[in-house]
A protein has these predicted regions:
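Two-metal-ion RNase H-like nuclease active-site motif
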Residues: 184, 342-346, 416
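Short acidic-aromatic active-site loops that bind/stabilize oxyanions
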Residues: 159, 349-350
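Charged, compositionally biased N-terminal leader segments and the immediate start
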Residues: 1-22
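Short amphipathic alpha-helical interaction patches enriched in hydrophobic/aromatic residues
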Residues: 14-21, 151-155, 442, 446, ...
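Accessory alpha-helical DNA-binding modules that contact the DNA backbone or grooves
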Residues: 14, 24-231, 238, 243, ...
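Charged catalytic cores and adjacent phosphate/nucleic-acid-binding surfaces used
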Residues: 191-277, 281, 285-348, 354-374, ...
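Short loop/edge segments at beta-strand edges and connector loops
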Residues: 183-186, 413-415, 505
Length: 574
């Protein structure tokens, strides 16, 4: 059993325990185990095979270690099976719907005998949900919207989940005899925040052995198509993968075609037609040439050059102005991970982080950062161990001590301060003034009407001590919708006030999304890219934020934490 399946089973256990109203700390332990497993780069089966102590992993105690060993050795988890026998499986699916959750899922199941998404939709449409105590018409509308979102995105994988399935497959395929080139195309290559399926393109002197090896991959659950140059498999995780072996002379054209997006390809082909050319997945052809000779196609840049375009990075290929920009000349170089000089949002053991301040500082210095920010939660988030004024002063004293031991990196003291329901901040003004940076976030009251939510955020941003608005829409991809608010107005006001907006690199957030980032840049907003790391390993999530920024067309000059410290510090002042 591979890491994605292990993480999925732990997530399932946590869901069932939540339905059963188990101890919140036990539920949290399983969710922490999910995060640990998902952040690993080494397969857990190797840990088990090499008899390495699994308890060395953060968040993995003896019970979790035994569970992992059992899953690796048997392919299942008896404890999970016992739990599932106690709870209708349909309840798990119901609680994953945006706008429902475990308590409401249990209620609709118990009182209306609803056991499927289809039955829930029928009950919502005929008004039975609204009649339940504690629900009402507004809850019913949100459930219907959640069902629609679930059907659109529920079967899609987050980028890291897809990576942990795709990378081992690529390594396996690269051992195929006759394989000359292999790349991933599709939304995976464009680095979309969720992935539905995977497209692989290859060049091979002998296509058949590559296809046979592909279909023999140990993680295959089903074979949907078995051809000489194209095959389709479904992995045990449910991820569908297509592999095509194409001729070398048309590889670049095929890579463009299967990378997409559809909108990008339509505009590209239209531009070709205007020039008497035809672009397909096989190459570029002269429409007036009776011989139907391919005039370009081996490399992507050759295809773009035939229609007088500079090469367009895959992340930008969404049909949102990138072709028009490339027609004017080479596109600006997009931001890279190595451009970033600091991480401005992370947590320590003072709240819900897994590492001490010193450990986080050492890890940031090892990554070559010039500066970093410690930003633990404020007191209203009781489950995270948020800090009140007294504990915050104690933390400042520790930061001063760590600063003295680490002159190689600037350590800024900050806090991720909750925006309360009325828009006030969860920390006294005197303490806010003592922070180097003030980060503010929404962690509650996600269901406020859009106008009230907008007023709430605007009030918080208007506080003179606020510097950064973190994960602005509070979304959790595939799990929680963005809060309803006038984001355009909020971004405009943030630009006027000099408040930066965060691109949170956590793959289950990636908040702001690419289109909002593009708008933020157009409005003159300051933008920062942070990890929101809760453990050392999560500092490496920065690359997902950078990929999202690249999708928005951002350069290093568009992001504040690419600046040297003195310039960064000046830029962050209001």
């Amino acid at each position: 059993m591979e890491n994605p399946e292990i993480a999925r089973i732990f997530e399932e256990v946590a869901d069932v325990l939540e339905i059963q109203n188990e101890n919140p700390f036990r539920i949290r332990a399983y969710r922490n185990a999910v995060r640990t497993v998902e952040s690993l780069t080494t397969p857990l089966r190797k840990w088990v095979e090499e008899n390495r102590p699994l308890t060395d992993l953060q968040g993995i105690g003896k019970e979790m270690a035994n569970h992992i060993k059992e899953m690796v050795e048997t392919g299942t988890l008896g404890f999970r099976d016992e739990l599932l026998a106690e709870v209708p499986r349909s309840l798990i699916e119901l609680m994953r719907l945006p706008g429902l959750g475990p308590k409401k899922a249990r209620k609709v199941y118990d009182e209306l005998k609803i056991g499927s998404v289809d039955e829930l939709e029928a009950a919502a449409r005929d008004g039975r949900i609204a009649s339940l105590p504690g629900f009402g018409a507004k809850s019913q509308e949100k459930i219907l919207a959640g069902i629609q979102e679930y059907r659109q995105h529920g079967s899609r994988f987050l980028l890291p989940q897809a990576e942990r399935m795709v990378e081992p497959l690529l390594g396996y395929l690269r051992e195929s005899p006759g394989l000359e080139r292999l790349e991933v195309a599709g939304s995976y290559r464009r680095r979309k925040e969720t992935i539905g399926d995977i497209d692989l393109l290859a060049i091979a002197s002998q296509p058949l052995p590559v296809m046979e090896r592909f279909r023999a991959y140990p993680q295959v659950d089903k074979i949907l198509n078995a051809g000489d140059t194209k095959s389709t498999i479904v992995l045990g995780s449910g991820l569908q993968v297509d592999l095509r072996v194409v001729p070398a002379e048309g590889y670049g054209a095929a890579l463009i075609y299967f990378t997409g997006s559809k909108e990008h390809n339509v505009k590209l082909r239209r531009r070709a037609v205007e020039r008497g050319l035809r672009i397909s997945e096989y190459g570029v052809f002269n429409e007036h040439d009776g011989d139907n000779e391919c005039i370009a196609g081996r490399e992507e840049a050759d295809v773009y050059a035939t229609v007088r375009l500079s090469w367009i990075p895959p992340e930008m290929r969404e049909g949102r102005g990138e072709i028009e920009a490339a027609a004017k000349g080479p596109l600006p170089e997009l931001i890279r991970v190595e451009d970033l000089r600091g991480d401005l949002h992370m947590h320590s053991t003072w709240s819900d982080g897994r590492n001490s301040i010193e450990e986080m500082v050492t890890a940031c210095a090892a990554r070559g950062y010039e500066y970093m920010v410690i930003s633990d939660h404020s007191k209203s988030l009781a489950m995270t161990g948020g800090l009140d004024a007294y504990r915050l002063r104690l933390q400042w004293a520790e930061i001063d001590q760590v600063r003295a031991r680490h002159p190689e990196i600037r350590i800024l003291r900050a806090m991720e301060v909750d925006i309360l329901g009325d828009g006030s901040l969860d920390l006294e003004d005197e303490m806010l003034a003592g922070l180097d940076l003030v980060l503010v976030s929404l962690h509650s009251r996600f269901d406020l009407p859009a106008d009230q939510q907008t007023e709430r955020v605007l009030k918080a941003l208007s506080h003179p001590e606020v510097n950064i608005f973190c994960h602005p829409t509070a979304r959790l991809i595939n799990r929680r919708k963005p809060v309803e608010m006038d984001l355009d107005l909020i971004l405009r006001r943030a630009a006027e006030l000099g408040v930066a907006v965060e691109l949170n690199s956590s793959p289950n957030r990636l908040d702001l999304k690419d289109t909002h980032l593009k708008l933020a840049r157009e409005l003159g907003c300051k933008v920062v890219i942070d990890t929101d790391a809760h453990r050392i390993g999560e500092l490496d999530l920065m690359r997902y934020g950078v990929e999202q920024a690249r999708r928005a067309g951002l350069t290093a000059g568009d992001v504040m934490n690419t600046l040297p410290f003195e310039k960064f510090w000046a830029a962050m002042q209001r």
